[in-house]
Amino acid sequence: MLILCAINLLQAGSVFALGQDREDGLPGMPYRTPDEKEFRVCADPENMPYSNEKGEGFENKIAEVLAKDLGKELSYEFWLDRQGYLRNTINAQRCDVIMGMGSDVDNLRTSKPYYRSGYVFVYRKSSNYNIKDWDSPDLRKGIIGLVGQSPPAIALRDHDLMGNAHPYRLQRDLNLPPSEMIDDLVAGKNDIVIIWGPIGGYFAKQSKEPLVIVPIPEFKSEQNSLDTQKGKLEFNISVAVR
């Protein structure tokens, strides 16, 4: 699958060959000079399990494989994944690709998906909960932590569970660790957490408190046809190029 990704990137052509308008990024930042021998990746320097400056994330490892398959030298443009991330990185021509983007992201070309993931329920093993899906009775017994305005919020609403919700910011507070939701679960601030699979699995595995992780079945809203896509819980992930 990784080799197919590399082939797809080659077929897509160089980011600099595409005739799209360039956004300038922040004032005073120099433009990057293209190098045919370089495979430059935009990534967050503090976003495990995906990436960090030490190259320990799984997206770092996939980028290494792609660079090797393409016969190029891997390099990075690190930028915190905040508002303006695309504008200040790939759209400002400071890299060739971004790993781990949704396959249907607007304004960027994407490779064939190299993995698919969804959301998970995470809860303390000591709670003796038995949660398998949205209709599980134990889901109504406690406080449910989730990112506000994320796709699972539609399912939470449709199952009359909004009263149990403990919402978190859509854009992470950089003063807090990426493990914040799992840390709060362990500390008893939440009884259940609904979180994106790779993040939940990574931090749950590191927890000293035994935690249960349950993949959430795909969901489609029945209340409003406009919510069908918003209620989607599983997504294809690709490499994005301009």
What does each model-identified segment do?
Residues 18-106, 174-175:
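Extracytoplasmic small-molecule ligand-binding "clamshell" domains
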